[in-house]
Amino acid sequence: MNSSFSHLDGQGNVTMVDVGGKQATERVAIAEAVVELRPATLELLLKVALPKGDVLTCAKIGGIMAAKRVGEIIPLCHPLSLTYADIRFEVSEAPPRIRIEAETRTVGNTGVEMEAIVAAQTAAAVIYDMCKAVQRDIIISRVRLLHKRGGKSGEFNAPDMEE
């Protein structure tokens, strides 16, 4: 079977990619997620007045923790030694939303895109969890890879991120 999917062998069976022969290079990935809230919920979040406490600090910690565990929760992902992981927030009051940007880095022979994506998703889920007592219809959207650099495939920028 001829497949362009890297996690399938010649017979179409699922397999973990052998990255042992790949060159170790600096790998960087940035992903985003957007959390849409009602104005009153965002106001409580920013005032640190929600019942569960400081939402953004917990979301940052949760996202970083998730980035470090991707090899355990995403099938066929290699466990990586991250050299850097960070979560940044861009808060908008109109429309009321929080844009999450997750950045991950390593020096290794496989990329860190999944680590960045899972970190952004998890930070968004933490925000949902900590705000759900006051709002159940929170929307998590626009989870995507914005940028990756390093390795054989080179650099990628999401189409609307091109300069």
Swiss-Prot record:
GO BP: Mo-molybdopterin cofactor biosynthetic process
Residues at the active site: 129
GO-annotated molecular function: cyclic pyranopterin monophosphate synthase activity
Pfam families: MoaC
InterPro entries named among the record's database cross-references: MoaC, MoaC_bact/euk, MoaC_sf, MoCo_biosynth_MoaA/MoaC, Mopterin_CF_biosynth-C_dom
Catalytic activity: (8S)-3',8-cyclo-7,8-dihydroguanosine 5'-triphosphate = cyclic pyranopterin phosphate + diphosphate
Cysteine pairs bridged by disulfides in the record: none
Residues involved in substrate binding: 76-78, 114-115
Keywords, comma-separated and alphabetical: Lyase, Molybdenum cofactor biosynthesis
Pathway(s) of this molecule: Cofactor biosynthesis; molybdopterin biosynthesis
Enzyme Commission code(s) on record: 4.6.1.17
Major enzyme class: lyase
Keyword Ribosomal protein applies: no
Keyword Nucleotidyltransferase: no
Function: Catalyzes the conversion of (8S)-3',8-cyclo-7,8-dihydroguanosine 5'-triphosphate to cyclic pyranopterin monophosphate (cPMP).
Family indicated by similarity: Belongs to the MoaC family.
PANTHER family tied to this protein: MOLYBDOPTERIN COFACTOR SYNTHESIS PROTEIN A
Quaternary structure, from the entry: Homohexamer; trimer of dimers.
Protein name: Cyclic pyranopterin monophosphate synthase
